[in-house]
Regions:
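Bacterial N-terminal signal peptides
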Residues: 8-16
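Long, contiguous binding/interaction regions
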Residues: 22-128, 132-156
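Bacterial N-terminal signal peptides that target proteins for export
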Residues: 1-9
């Protein structure tokens, strides 16, 4: 009886360790996303691949107190595979007012929809805007579009 239970447990453990073809496809997709974005992200247990981009180039102050990039001044993009095999991306981009049009133009040119443009703070200097977006399609193509949008940040 114990031997049989151990045998079943061993089989279940081996089965749990197998990587499905879809997981391999996702791993390859995340590698392409990282290459297109120029930065690796983190894969969560629920299959969301997220890459963050702190805006350490911005010198923002709130009531004279410096706001570090890690305190709400980071752009991010999160990807997941949909049941139909396409990928979805959602994200948030931190920007100055002068960066809004170039970033939105780059996102829309790549078929990514802008779903919100607003601020997260009041009284900060300089004023910082946040653009939320979403898109569906090929993971690498979405990542290339986001890279083109991020490349608009920090230009003078």
């Amino acid at each position: 009886m114990i031997r049989r239970a151990l045998g079943v447990a061993a089989i279940l453990l081996c089965a749990a360790m197998l990587v499905t073809p879809q997981e391999k496809k996702d791993d390859a997709a995340w590698e392409k996303v990282a290459a297109a974005l120029g930065k690796k992200g983190d894969l969560s247990a629920d299959g969301v691949y997220k890459v963050t981009f702190p805006r350490s180039d911005l010198k923002v102050a709130m009531h004279g107190v410096p706001v570090p990039a890690g305190m709400g001044l980071a752009s991010w993009a999160a990807f997941t595979r949909m049941p139909d095999g396409k990928y979805m991306v959602m994200g948030d981009t931190v920007m100055l007012g002068a960066e809004v049009n170039p970033v939105s133009d780059a996102l829309r040119a790549g078929g990514i929809e802008i779903v919100a443009l607003h601020n997260h703070m009041l009284g900060e200097q300089p004023q910082v805007m946040f653009m939320h977006y979403q898109g569906e399609g090929d993971a690498e193509a979405l990542a290339r579009t986001i890279r083109r949008a991020l490349d608009q940040l920090g230009r003078k």
